[in-house]
């Protein structure tokens, strides 16, 4: 008696429930089913990279890079993208349009000078596409955010509703950085790696920060699990032993990250820095002798 609206499953099947009041042998109803294919020519994956916090961030006036990948392989039209948020349109540097047969592009978005450190905005995309001799058409919410989210959190099926098709942009304090002390040691030596968080802006405080180390070869047996960062002391120390078979003279680049929620903010932030570990040993001694 009423028109029914359903979203069909991926295999195209639609199930109809026969009323319990229908008696055997009664006249059957004839269902007219019409299907409309919802085209998604302007849906893009946001490439979040390895960022576990799933945000882009920058200082007021700086630029951030968005990497977008189209869900379509071929384009017969030209597409123009405009990022916007609660503050209106964002200024874009460089080309913001995709020509024919191009589905991937990067473009730089400026963090407004008027935004203050600690503020958030949720970026969306407004897209316009047009063919020769055709009228221009526009869509909004053209991001497909689920892929980026699932790459980082595979055990969580969907992002929070507030983040669907939106990229959180966070305005960074001007001075928060991870500091690492230089490290050298020979094969078999036990060394320490000190990680500290330098904050020049006292208004920001990490809540339950964790420290992680990345880039170490497996044979170095550096713990993969994040460790507590001592807020009172302002640093964390990693102790590890350089494997005896490590070749002297080699240099290994690793990096440390400090992860935590900034006070009064909902989303996780990660700050990181790189450091090189120099392997000393007999080869160095021979060079000095020569």
Language-model features: locations:
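Short strand-edge motifs at loop-to-beta-strand transitions and within beta-strands
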Residues: 2-4, 64, 103-107, 191, ...
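C-terminal edge strands of extracellular/lumenal beta-sandwich accessory domains
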Residues: 3-69, 73-75, 126-143, 176-181, ...
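Short proline/glycine- and polar residue-rich coil/turn motifs
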Residues: 7-9, 96-105, 114, 226-236, ...
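Surface-exposed loops/turns
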Residues: 9-11, 59-60, 100, 117, ...
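Short glycine/proline/serine/threonine-rich loop/turn segments at secondary-structure transition edges
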Residues: 25-28, 113-124, 244-253
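Low-complexity, Pro/Ser/Thr- and charge-rich linker/hinge segments at domain boundaries
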Residues: 35-59, 149-182, 278-290
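Aromatic/hydrophobic beta-strand junction motif of beta-rich domains
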Residues: 66-72, 109, 193-199, 240
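Short, solvent-exposed loop/linker segments at beta-strand-coil boundaries, enriched for Pro/Gly
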Residues: 83-95, 212-224
